[in-house]
UniProtKB/Swiss-Prot annotation:
EC number: 3.6.4.12
InterPro entries in the record: BRK_domain, BRK_sf, Bromodomain, Bromodomain-like_sf, Bromodomain_CS, Gln-Leu-Gln_QLQ, Helicase_ATP-bd, Helicase_C-like
Domain Helicase C-terminal: 1102-1263
Stretches with biased composition (Basic and acidic residues): 699-708
Modified residues (Phosphoserine): S695, S698, S1407, S1411, S1591, S1594
Annotated catalysed reactions: ATP + H2O = ADP + phosphate + H(+)
SUPFAM superfamilies, alphabetized: beta-sandwich domain of Sec23/24, BRK domain-like, Bromodomain, P-loop containing nucleoside triphosphate hydrolases
Role this protein plays: Transcriptional regulator. Acts as a coactivator, assisting one or more dedicated transcriptional activators of ANTC and BXC homeotic gene clusters. Can counteract the repressive effect of Polycomb protein. ATPase subunit of the Brahma complex, a multiprotein complex which is the equivalent of the yeast SWI/SNF complex and acts by remodeling the chromatin by catalyzing an ATP-dependent alteration in the structure of nucleosomal DNA. This complex can both serve as a transcriptional coactivator or corepressor, depending on the context.
Domain called HSA: residue spans: 501-573
Polar residues: compositionally biased ranges: 710-724
Compositional bias per record (Acidic residues), positions renumbered to this chain: 1380-1391, 1557-1574
Annotated positions binding ATP: D798, E799, M800, G801, L802, G803, K804, T805
Protein name: ATP-dependent helicase brm
Organism: Drosophila melanogaster
Classification of source organism: Eukaryota, Metazoa, Ecdysozoa, Arthropoda, Hexapoda
Length: 1638
């Protein structure tokens, strides 16, 4: 097959070899080639005779033209450059007449494709010249490698490629014929396995391989050199080397063997017709001559030798070209690839045909010619290293494999048989077939008949096509070219053209280089753009994925919130069934655990309630049997005649019978046992009878008409049947099922089991007169009666003011009227409410005999005698008398025990509970309380244990149920809102049968509202000075008279700092010597009166502004105070103001208290203020004629204050109630109020996990005390802001008219004050104080240490033992312990840092005092510097308008709390522009940053409260920008002015203007304070330790012992007799303290 001519060939012309690449390489395999790249293993030589080849069949040398067929070249392999003859690195397999060129696979897949280099001087069609031998290629490759090493280019990637080429070009394993044959066999096997036909070319190749004879045995002795047989050399052939000439010829009949040694590289095809022999080693090897280095031989299949193709035989007849220059091999061999006849070079038939491997004629048998284009081979070891011995060729024959030719022939035979069989079938078809089927059969028969003809025609056509398209010039382009002689002119033209070509080539090269650079740059840009687009796309995809997941998560969260809201809705709607379904769907283990726990607890409680009722029933039956037996004994013995009417059986009925007629009287008609004797005398002929069926007397005779409690569903079913409407009936039944008792268990409901006997009560008892009970009170009476009928005890816990007293009286009268239970009833009440109970009984039940058991011991003994002599129904007494006179009162068989203010029983171990449980016997008990849970859960358990000890036995079990439900599961103890509601509902479930609580807002809609305000009061200068030293050092300043230094000042330490601080907050004159020395300073007579009473106290000053306004608008005031000494000072103030008042405290006698209540509640009473102590007057009093409650100082227990508030906010109140709680800013009262709020929050939530199990230790209490004493003042200024007159007027006013009245009164007051005392403040300032009160810290510290000398050394008496105060006491007990047993120890701390920190804090506290001159000076300087700037900034903000609208108008003044109450709930720190302007005037801003902070807070408040799209929201954002811009503009102008002023004044002012001088003042002030700090670093800090007297802790408290005293230090006897009761040291009552007996 001819190759294309250079003119029309798409291949570029051959180029010279490059030094950077091997001189000659085979073309690389195309990546699109259908044939996989095979890397043959190393060759070890041909197998012995008869041994099968490497591919399963014996190696044979068949006739020419029967070699393996070539493979068709893929159409896209057009970039290959072919040489004119066979290349040294190419292996040309023999090709048949119809074989296409074959692409060799000698190079590795990653080898670059380079054109094959053609020898420039070789003749056309001749063999490659020796100059281009492989050895020269290796030398050129080595030179390129050495050149790169000299230039230091070892890191260049081409260097490693050259090394790989050098390593791989030294040995080849398989030649092209072997590879082709191997691939042909593999392809044939694959086609046979897939049952596919094999092409004709493949069949010819396989047949040629099969017909090759196996190589014969070697000729000659072992080791003798072999050569070709005689006559094989033709004329013109170069002479054979001597080694080959000396070889004897082979014997006849034995074919010569292939001369190719193992791993030899063929450089020419073998001679046709000559058998190839295995050449023995040459003589120089036998003589020990050194061999050239060879690669190590690895075992592998021997090469398959193929005969010369017929194309080469045809080319041998051509005339020989001139003989080229011979290349001498290293062993002195002859030129390569000489033909067998006359030395003519062999011409390959196709440029793609690979050569057969062979050895060079002169090379030793073991040497291998390097292959430049070979594949990856093993590297040649360096010279001098010993070569491994090649493996011996084994003589064992390999097993003969399957012959694909035989298989192919069998397949062809089968196909031919099938075709003939099919043709016979088609010829024998019946004539009855349809026309279309017969037509199809005829078509198929003709197609099968013409098959062989088609095959022959196709073969002839293909052969003719190949013969016609094959040209003689295909093999040799210059075959018919006429040579032309070269002349001088042509040479010059040639030179000129050559020069032009060079220039053009250089221009093209540069152009190509530029294009290459441009392409590289463009590729770089494209690459960057590609990656940028990829990143952008990836970012978009990531964003889309994130959005998808965010949306999915949002939807999931919305769904979860919806489900949670639905669960909460059903939970709050008591839909137990629906809630459990949602819990099952959510599969929340915690909620399911709570529900299962609740069911378990309710089940246990149900069993305990059943057991309790059974036990009570058995006791009642046994008691009835015992009474019947006792009555029978009295009748039999006749002792009933003189029976005592107070006997337990005196009221039992006795059945009588008339002897003559047999008539019987039973039931109510029968006489009582106490009247039996008189009745028998009046009715002769009658006699008593013994009736065994007589049960339990009057109790059985008067059984209540009761019925079993029907469920709500049964009632609804009855109503539905009565209505007759199906839809209404369904709705009614469904609603009833939801409203039915949610505590349903398997058998019966928990509540219905507890209240099995249900008695309907529709009206009050007939003996209850002078009023009618409200509907909810009737329901409460019905519940109380149900408790009685079911032998249960309970708690009536209605909110304060709903009439628990009236409901109790109605229960007593109902039992007396309907049940005939005449008593006696024991009602235990506080002493302060005892007169109120007596009044209520006199009003509502005058027919009931009531005994008020109180008074002195002599009076109580008279009452005891009276009780024995006369009948009574109710005994009213107090807690103390129940304990004191238990020997007398416990003997009475009480029917019912009722305890008012039942939260007094909150301590299970208190003396009252123990006495009532051990000494008093009452089958029924009832507690009345408005606050069943005050502090912690065990208090509630104590109440339930007192009522039902058989049900609520263990406190720990009760606490575990409701305190830490998850403590046993190992999960976190904290509860979320839903779990908390479940726990609360669990508590309500447990308490529902035993506790009834209604709120005012639920039952009394007409009751007016109650609004509470906290009014903050400022301190006077006297209060600030005393409070500062008491807080920091625990000392009270004196004038020094106790040390004989009158007027020079002094200090003394006082116990119980917290109480002293509270006293200073109320009034400084609660310390008597302060009042006396102040009188000496002002010229008084020991007692201060007049305006100075309110000017020295912030709270009194506030009262002086409030009380006249309330009196002018006809409001009446209840003023509650904790300390009776403060009440005395308030009395002096009220007397000076001439306000009518009444006073009730712990010292008020019981008989006087009722009179005080009547006087205040009387119509037309002129009493304006009722002055009460919180403990004495805060319980059980009806003072609804007052509508204003002033809490002068808060109690530690918030429920005490709530009780006090409800004295006015109760049934009967017609006006809105205002509660004003006074609190001094920056004082201990803030912490007290915070603790009260904490307790109220606890009471509202009823229970929180882990909240009630904390037991305070001594260290915790110490830390709490230190926190109160040394509180930091870093709170917001808004929280410490004192309200002005306008705000106070809004708090106390009930209408707009009152606000106008209050404004007018404020103006009149200010005018009057200005006229009387012009320029004087309402609170005294520091300038009005004595000199001994204005001492600095150094002097006070010195006074303190002088006072400490006596304290530290002592007076010689024994030291009080220190008690570890770590038990669990309430705040009341703790404060009482501080009052009675605490003392101070001063110790010096060693840490200077702590001392400095404390001094720094003290200095900060001093900075808040207006009395400091330095602070005033700074504020004055501050006014001059920045007040003008602040006004300018605020003016710019106020005047800013947009679209003709002033933006600041809505922000000027906030709406009132009445108009917008929710605003003040959402916004914690309300601010408006008017307030900011007022603060600028008051110099409360130190710099512009504070002003900006407040203004930004104003804008943030507007943005928090309003929606984003609202106009106010947008205006607030705009005002923020206006403020920032105005500040920058004004401050820049001020700085420029300051710089100009500095330039004008020169160097006299230092570095700047007024700002720097102000800074100098500030620095000087700071330096002075630092000096003060340094001077006082040796001062000792006071550290307080709590100590409790052991005798106080162990001895039981009595009313006199439990009274708290005001500790005033070493109090001296007053020299002058004052009208105040200074000897009275009580500030709380003793008889009403709820902790005196705990």
């Amino acid at each position: 097959m001819a190759s294309p001519s250079p003119a029309n060939s798409p291949m570029p012309p051959p180029q010279a070899p490059s030094p950077m690449a091997p001189p000659s390489q085979s073309p690389a395999p195309s990546p699109h080639s259908p044939y996989p790249h095979q890397q043959p293993g190393p060759l070890q030589g041909p197998p012995p005779p008869g041994h099968p080849g490497a591919y399963g069949h014996p190696m044979q040398h068949g006739p020419p033209g029967q070699g393996p067929p070539g493979h068709h070249m893929p159409p896209h392999h057009q970039g290959m450059i072919f040489s004119k003859g066979p290349h040294m690195g190419m292996q040309m397999p023999p090709t048949g007449p119809n074989m296409s060129p074959y692409q060799t696979h000698g190079m590795p897949p990653n080898a670059p494709t380079q054109p094959c280099i053609v020898s420039p001087g070789g003749p056309p069609g001749g063999p490659p010249p020796p100059e281009r031998s492989s050895q020269e290629n290796l030398h050129a490759l080595q030179r390129a490698i050495d050149s790169m090493e000299e230039k230091g280019l070892q890191e260049d990637p081409r260097y490693s490629q050259l090394l790989a080429m050098r390593a791989t070009s030294k040995h080849q394993h398989l030649n092209g014929n072997q590879v082709n044959l191997l691939r042909t066999q593999i392809t044939a096997y694959r086609l046979l396995a897939r049952n596919k036909p094999i092409s004709m070319q493949m069949q010819q190749a396989l047949q040629a391989a099969q017909q090759q004879p196996p190589p014969g045995p070697p000729i000659g002795p072992p080791g003798a050199p072999g050569g070709p047989p005689p006559g094989s050399q033709h004329a013109g052939q170069p002479p054979v080397p001597p080694q080959q000439q000396q070889q004897p010829p082979p014997s006849a009949g034995t074919p010569p063997q292939c001369s190719t040694p193992p791993a030899s590289n063929p450089y020419g095809p073998p001679v046709p017709g000559q058998k190839m022999q295995v050449a023995p080693p040459p003589p120089h090897m036998q003589q020990g001559q050194p061999l050239p280095p060879q690669p190590p031989q690895v075992g592998g299949p021997p090469p398959i030798q193929q005969q010369q193709p017929p194309q080469q035989q045809q080319q041998q007849s051509q005339p020989p070209p001139p003989e080229p220059h011979q290349h001498q091999l290293p062993n002195g061999g002859k030129p390569l690839s000489m033909g067998p006849s006359g030395g003519q070079p062999l011409i390959p038939s196709s440029p793609m045909q690979p050569q057969v491997r062979g050895t060079l004629p002169g090379m030793p048998p073991g040497s291998q010619v390097p292959q430049p284009g070979g594949g990856p081979q093993r590297q040649v070891p360096p010279a001098g290293m010993p070569m491994p011995k090649p493996n011996r060729i084994t003589t064992v024959a390999k097993p003969v494999g399957l012959d694909p030719i035989t298989l192919l022939q069998e397949r062809e035979n089968r196909i031919a048989a099938r075709i003939s069989l099919r043709m016979q079938e088609l010829q024998r078809l019946p004539a009855t077939m349809s026309e279309d089927l017969r037509l199809q059969a005829a078509i198929e028969l003709r197609a099968l008949r013409v098959l062989n003809f088609q095959r022959q025609l196709r073969m002839e056509f293909v052969q003719c096509t190949r013969r016609d398209t094959t040209l003689e010039t295909a093999l040799n382009i210059k075959l018919y070219k006429r040579t032309k002689r070269q002349g001088l002119r042509e040479a010059r033209a040639t030179e000129k053209l050559e020069k032009q070509q060079k220039l053009e080539a250089e221009r093209k090269r540069r152009q190509k280089h530029l294009e290459f650079l441009a392409a590289v740059l463009q590729h770089g840009k494209d690459l960057r753009e590609f990656h940028r687009n990829n990143k952008a796309q990836l970012a978009r995809m990531n964003k889309a994925v994130m959005n998808h997941h965010a949306n999915a998560e949002r939807e999931q969260k919305k769904e979860q919130e919806r489900i949670e809201k639905e669960r909460m809705r059903r939970l709050m709607a008591e839909d137990e069934e629906g809630y459990r379904k949602l819990i099952d769907q959510k599969k929340d283990k915690r909620l399911a655990f709570l529900l299962s726990q609740t069911d378990e607890y309710i089940s246990n409680l149900t069993q305990m309630v059943k057991q309790h009722k059974d036990d009570q029933m058995k006791k009642k039956e046994e008691e009835g049997k015992r009474l019947i037996q006792f009555k029978k004994e009295l009748l039999m013995s006749g002792e009933y005649i003189g029976i005592d009417e107070g006997s337990i059986v005196a009221d039992m009925r006795v059945h009588v019978v008339e002897q003559c007629t047999g008539k019987k009287l039973t039931g109510d008609d029968a006489p009582m046992l106490k009247h039996l004797h008189r009745w028998l005398n009046m009715h002769p002929g009658w006699d008593w009878i013994d009736d065994e069926e007589d049960s339990c007397g009057s109790n059985d005779d008067h059984k209540p008409k009761v019925e079993e409690q029907p469920t709500a569903t049964e009632d609804a079913t009855d109503k539905a049947q009565a209505t007759g409407n199906d839809e209404d009936a369904k709705d009614l039944i469904t609603k009833a099922k939801v409203e039915d008792d949610e505590y349903r268990t398997e058998e019966q409901t928990y509540y219905s089991i507890a209240h099995t006997i249900h008695e309907k009560v529709v009206e009050q008892a007939s003996i209850m007169v002078n009023g009618t009970l409200k509907e909810y009170q009737i329901k409460g009476l019905e519940w109380l009666v149900s408790l009685y009928n079911n032998n249960l005890n309970g708690i009536l816990a209605d909110e304060m003011g709903l009439g628990k007293t009236i409901q109790t009286i109605s229960l007593v009268t109902y039992l007396m009227d309907r049940k005939k239970v005449m008593g006696p009833y024991l009602i235990i009440v506080p002493l302060s409410t005892l007169p109120n109970w007596v009044l209520e009984f006199e009003k509502w039940a005058p027919a009931v005999g009531v005994v008020s058991y109180k008074g002195s011991p002599q009076g109580r003994r008279l009452l005891q005698n009276q009780m024995r002599a006369t009948k009574f129904n109710v005994l009213l007494t107090t807690y103390e008398y129940v304990i004191k006179d238990k020997a007398v009162l416990a003997k009475i068989q009480w029917k019912y025990m009722i305890i008012d203010e039942g939260h007094r029983m909150k301590n299970h171990h208190c003396k009252l509970t123990q006495v009532l449980n051990t000494h008093y016997i009452a089958p029924y008990r009832l507690l009345l309380t408005g606050t069943p849970l005050q502090n912690k859960l065990p208090e509630l358990w104590a109440l339930l244990n007192f009522l039902l000890p058989s049900i609520f036995k263990s406190c720990s079990t009760f606490e575990q149920w409701f305190n830490a439900p998850f403590a046993t599961t190992g999960e976190k103890v904290e509860l979320n809102e839903e779990e908390t509601i479940l726990i609360i509902r669990r508590l309500h479930k447990v308490l529902r049968p035993f506790l009834l609580r209604r709120l005012k807002k639920e039952v009394e809609h007409q009751l007016p509202d109650k609004v509470e305000y906290i009014i903050k009061c400022d301190m006077s200068a006297l209060q600030r000075v005393l409070y500062k030293h008491m807080q920091s050092k625990g000392v009270l300043l004196t004038d020094g008279s106790e040390k004989g230094k009158h007027g020079k000042g002094g200090a003394k330490a006082l116990m119980n700092t917290i109480v002293q601080l509270r006293k200073l907050c109320n009034h400084p004159f609660m310390f008597q010597h302060i009042e006396e020395k102040y009188c000496d300073h002002t010229g008084g007579h020991g007692v201060v009166s007049g305006p100075d009473l309110y000017r020295v106290s912030g709270k009194f000053e506030l009262l002086d502004r409030i009380l006249p306004k309330l009196k002018a608008t006809n409001h009446r005031v209840l003023l509650f105070c904790q300390m009776t000494q403060c009440m005395t000072i308030i009395e002096d103030y009220l007397g000076w103001r001439q306000f009518g008042y009444l006073r009730l405290d712990g010292t008020t006698k019981a008989e006087d208290r009722g009179e005080l209540l009547r006087k205040f509640n009387a119509k037309g009473s002129d009493v304006f203020v009722f002055l009460l102590s919180t403990r004495a007057g805060g319980l059980g009093l009806n003072l609804q004629t007052a509508d204003t409650v002033v809490i002068f100082d808060s109690d530690w227990n918030p429920h005490q204050d709530l009780q006090a508030q409800d004295r006015a906010h109760r049934i009967g109140q017609r006006n809105e109630v205002r509660v004003l709680r006074l609190m001094t800013v920056n004082s201990v009262e803030e912490r007290i109020l915070a603790a009260a709020r904490y307790k109220l929050n606890m009471d509202e939530k009823v229970i929180q996990a882990g909240m009630f199990d904390q037991k305070s230790t001594g260290s915790e209490r110490q830390q709490f005390l230190q926190t109160i004493l040394h509180q930091d003042d870093n709170e917001e200024e808004e929280e410490n802001e004192v309200p002005d007159d306008e705000m106070i007027n809004m708090m106390i006013a009930r209408s707009e008219e009152e606000i106008e009245i209050f404004k007018r009164m404020d103006a009149e007051r200010k005018k009057e004050d200005e006229e009387i005392h012009p320029g004087r403040e309402r609170l005294i300032d520091e300038s009005e104080l004595p000199d001994w009160l204005t001492k600095d810290d150094d002097e006070v510290e010195r006074f303190h240490y002088q006072y400490d000398e006596d304290t530290i050394l002592g007076r010689g008496s024994r030291q009080r033992k220190e008690v570890d105060y770590t038990d669990s006491l309430t705040e009341k007990e703790w404060l009482k312990a501080i009052d009675d047993g605490a003392e101070f120890d001063e110790e010096e701390e060693e840490d200077d840092s702590k001392r400095k920190r404390r001094k720094r804090k003290n200095r900060k506290e001093e900075s808040d005092d207006d009395s400091l001159i330095l602070k005033r000076r700074r504020r004055q300087n501050l006014d001059k510097r920045s007040k003008k700037q602040m006004h300018k900034i605020m003016s710019a903000v106020i005047k800013h308008n947009q679209d003709g609208r002033t933006l600041s108008e809505p922000f000027m003044k906030l709406p009132s709390r009445q108009r917008l109450p929710d605003y003040y709930e959402i916004i914690k720190r309300p601010v408006d522009i008017k307030k900011i302007l007022q603060r600028i005037e008051d110099c409360k801003y130190a710099d512009l940053n504070e002003l900006e902070k407040d203004f930004m807070q104003l804008c943030q408040n507007a943005q928090i409260y309003n929606e984003e799209a609202s106009l106010i929201y947008l205006d607030s954002i705009a005002l923020q920008k206006v403020f920032v811009g105005a500040r920058q503009r004004i401050t820049a102008a001020a700085d420029a002015a300051a710089v100009a002023a500095g330039d004008n004044t020169g160097e006299a002012h230092g570095n700047g203007g007024s700002d720097n001088s102000d800074n100098d003042d500030d620095d000087g002030g700071d330096d002075g304070s630092d000096d003060e700090e340094i001077a006082t670093t040796s001062a000792a800090a006071v550290k307080m330790k709590l100590k409790l007297n052991k005798s106080l802790a162990s001895a039981p408290a009595t009313p006199t012992q439990s009274s708290s005293n005001v500790s005033s230090g070493a109090a001296t006897t007053s020299k002058k007799q004052t009208r105040r009761k200074r000897s009275q040291k009580k500030y709380t009552i003793s008889d009403d303290d709820d902790d005196d007996m705990d």
